[in-house]
Amino acid sequence: SYILLALPLLLGSCEAYLDVNPKSEVTDKELFSTAEGCEDAIYGIYTEMGTNKNLFAYALTFAYPELMTGNFTISQSDNLAYVVQRLWEHENAITVAENLWINGYKAIGYVNKALMHVLPKSDDEFRHIRLYKGELLALRAYLHFEMARIFAVPFASGDAAAKAKAIPYVTTYGIEVTPYSSLDKVFELIVADLTEAEKYLAADEELVTATRDNASDGFT
């Protein structure tokens, strides 16, 4: 009986403990409770994409694509050298692929986490909420396009089995494992995200004051 009486107290203590956050940390609920927080989250995703060498700071910009086309050579001490030589089973080539895969889907996870908080919000809550939604959906489509570009076979491939199992197209944030989609389905989902993003981003002209005519003047 003493145990039963004490149980609610213990459970209450656990809930109180789980609700306590270090002063230096900001919870997701707090972060996405303001427009500035939403923007910080989006900036954070761009920062991760732009500074991570396993993404656009190196691997996905000039390194992996250019080396695969044979435009440049690379030191044998770099793991990418094994990719260039098509030594796919070598542990160094596997490391390159794993890093690309893990960091690419980690970035997609950040996007989905932000969308989880942003999509339910109405226009009345934040002035630019439609732009946040559109930008995040476009980012999700773009990141999946990059993953398909690197890891999936091309449309022209005759390998039906490989095309049937291209990459996972992840649209939720959580511990659930997303199954692989076919190449056709991946691009169907990319187009769907971009179409939805375009609808939201159409609010740009209404919400953002800017000179839009002759934007290319001065460029050759």
In which residue ranges do the predicted regions lie?
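Membrane-proximal, proline-rich intrinsically disordered regions
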Residues: 14-63
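Inward-facing hydrophobic residues that define packing positions of alpha-helical scaffold repeats
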Residues: 42, 108-111, 187, 194
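Conserved, well-structured interaction surfaces
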Residues: 79-151, 176-184, 198-202
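Bacterial N-terminal signal peptides
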Residues: 2-11
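Aromatic- and glycine-enriched pocket-lining scaffold segments that form the walls
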Residues: 201, 212-220
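Extended ligand-binding groove/face enriched in aromatic
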Residues: 142-173
